[in-house]
């Protein structure tokens, strides 16, 4: 069993904050109930969404990154997860970019930081993801990722507040591209009336989206072009 455990803070250093031990990790538990092992680490908060690709069997996650570096840092992301991989938190991000709040710490980790597959807007607050395996949408949607973007709370211009589609082109692999799929939760004056949280495929092949802004569950159905 794999469990995503978010960090207990924004960027507290586990070296000096022992309460961060085994946080910002994806942990692997065995049925015997023994101590967990670390499947991947340095993932600040993937608690919103982990799922296995039906095409490749790989684990994927959507990640809420850290705050406090302005509007344009640090990007949230969606990525397949390499077992044993390090994704940067809290010292590094997006490959070899060091968080200035931890300048000079852990230089030995710089070249180990994995760059994610799909880079999103900073503060998008990417939550649950799912792979489309229904029969209602067109064939080109098969195996693609849908992800709920809860929306920013600390950015001067709002981002997120939508469901995005990550095309995997029936290969199970991302190219870095993504597209808006379900939008309209931000009105012209910048006010927000909906915030997507969860997304799943219904038995009839439609897409169900939970929204804690309007306290609704939306059904997205395909009726033809």
Tell me the role of every PLM-derived stretch.
Residues 197-213:
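C-terminal substrate/ligand-recognition segments
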Residues 7-37, 41-182, 188-194, 202, ...:
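Beta-propeller domain segments
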Residues 4:
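A conserved catalytic-loop motif detector
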Residues 66, 214-215:
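Loop/turn residues immediately N-terminal
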Residues 1, 57-59, 207, 217:
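Hydrophobic residues embedded in beta-strands of well-ordered beta-sheets
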